[in-house]
């Protein structure tokens, strides 16, 4: 297992003071515990992110960035882990070491996390961290999304009172039309986390269950005991803008790779 080591740095993002530590070879952010409303505020019965419910989260650490190709290569080189590179998928979508690793199934992401002494975040931890102390907002920064905010595919014309409209891919900072962007290419949220919307979707610990919010406990929920798919959050470089919303849920089979040119991950760690 990779040795954990810690260097403490304090930053300020917006109104939040952020504590960053270097652990397991990568930067992590201390996410202070608290209570939040999880789910879609305008959701309806039958939606997988309905009903909105109160959730209490203990403090934890979360990776500042998505795990990169370079970091995953180091894991493979040091452990000899048997990994299928997926021919063109990784190199076409994430061509350089500073891009997020893709084509990783849930078990491979878990193996990497365990090697670093960490774990995957729970779904509740992920949404709490993505919101970055903002209440009732759609994205980690607010209710409006532009090409200066994240790496994603496109808008649709049929949106809502916020006036989102169609946009070509190359308007704004997002210049990556059919690939990931280097991690940290866009502004962080208030916790100092980068790419919590777009770039790559991120694995969570939990099994996915469509109606789990109806039975979820309040304190540190960890998802159902069993399932067929694992939770994937955050949207990705080929998502339309609604897929990037902090409350948007999804699930994918944990052991297959056919969809995973858009799938990555980041790690979490308990506060001890």
Regions flagged by a language model, labelled:
Residues 17-18, 43-52, 169, 250-256:
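Short, P/G- and charge-enriched loop/turn segments at secondary-structure junctions
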Residues 21-86, 104-107, 198:
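A short glycine-rich, aromatic-capped structural motif
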Residues 37, 41-42, 82, 87-253, ...:
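Functional-site microenvironments in short loops/helix caps that host divalent-cation chemistry
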Residues 259-272:
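Short, structured beta-strand segments at or near domain termini in extracellular proteins/domains
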């Amino acid at each position: 297992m990779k040795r954990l080591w810690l260097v403490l740095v304090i930053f300020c993002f917006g109104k939040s003071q952020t504590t960053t530590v270097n652990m397991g070879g990568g930067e992590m952010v201390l996410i202070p515990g608290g209570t939040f409303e999880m789910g879609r505020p305008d959701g309806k019965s039958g939606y997988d992110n309905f009903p909105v419910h109160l959730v209490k989260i203990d403090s934890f650490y979360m990776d500042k960035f998505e795990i990169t190709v370079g970091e995953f290569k180091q894991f493979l080189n040091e452990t000899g882990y048997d990994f299928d590179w997926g021919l063109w998928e990784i190199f076409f979508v994430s061509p350089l070491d500073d891009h997020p690793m893709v084509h990783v199934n849930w078990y491979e992401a878990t193996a990497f996390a365990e090697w670093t002494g960490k774990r995957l975040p729970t779904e509740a931890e992920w949404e709490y961290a993505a919101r970055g102390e903002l209440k009732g907002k759609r994205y980690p920064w607010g209710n409006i999304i532009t090409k200066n905010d994240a790496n994603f595919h496109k808008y649709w014309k049929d949106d809502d009172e916020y006036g989102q409209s169609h946009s070509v891919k190359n308007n704004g900072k997002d210049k990556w039309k059919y690939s990931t962007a280097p991690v940290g290419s866009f502004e962080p949220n208030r916790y100092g986390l980068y790419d919590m919307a777009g770039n790559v979707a991120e694995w969570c610990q939990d099994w996915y269950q469509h109606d789990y919010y109806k039975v979820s406990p309040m304190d540190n929920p960890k998802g159902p005991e069993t399932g067929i798919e694992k939770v994937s959050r955050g949207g990705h470089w080929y998502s339309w803008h609604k897929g990037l919303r902090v409350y948007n849920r999804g699930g994918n089979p944990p052991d297959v790779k056919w969809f995973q040119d858009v799938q990555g991950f980041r790690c979490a760690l308990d506060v001890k």
